[in-house]
């Protein structure tokens, strides 16, 4: 049996600064794939903890890591890359992720161009609209993680 290889990764479900009064999440459109909306995420570097990677990735991708950590998904969750994009991370079949639910402290600190841009646009959307916007191959993972945070009373 062939074992799949997954890239270790962190992902952030970022609630707006108005949370818990409003339940809107941050999504961003990838700069390299028009129409590909997702949560901020990124690889965990050698010797880095998932929490350290989360703070670094948020600073790199959205220009701020001023967040309050609300919760963490209790285990790693994986998805496979679609066959048409496997070349991007040729050594991996997909990614295994550690999800964090966080609240952004100040929305006006978001700067997609602070570092090398990975996103072209962002928006805060209501949870009910989330899965319609997200790239199809990530929907099952998003559905599972969101369901967990709902069961735990965060969403």
Curated annotation (Swiss-Prot):
Its cofactor is:
a divalent metal cation
Report the protein name in the record.
RNA pyrophosphohydrolase
Signal peptide region:
none
Name the species this protein comes from: Helicobacter pylori (strain HPAG1)
Question: What InterPro entries does the entry give?
Answer: Nudix_hydrolase (IPR020476), NUDIX_hydrolase-like_dom_sf (IPR015797), NUDIX_hydrolase_CS (IPR020084), NUDIX_hydrolase_dom (IPR000086), RppH (IPR022927)
Q: GO molecular function terms here?
A: mRNA 5'-diphosphatase activity
State the organism's lineage. Bacteria, Pseudomonadati, Campylobacterota, Epsilonproteobacteria, Campylobacterales
Q: Which GO BP terms apply?
A: mRNA catabolic process
Residue numbers covered by motif Nudix box = 42-63
What EC numbers are recorded for this enzyme? 3.6.1.-
GO CC terms: cytoplasm
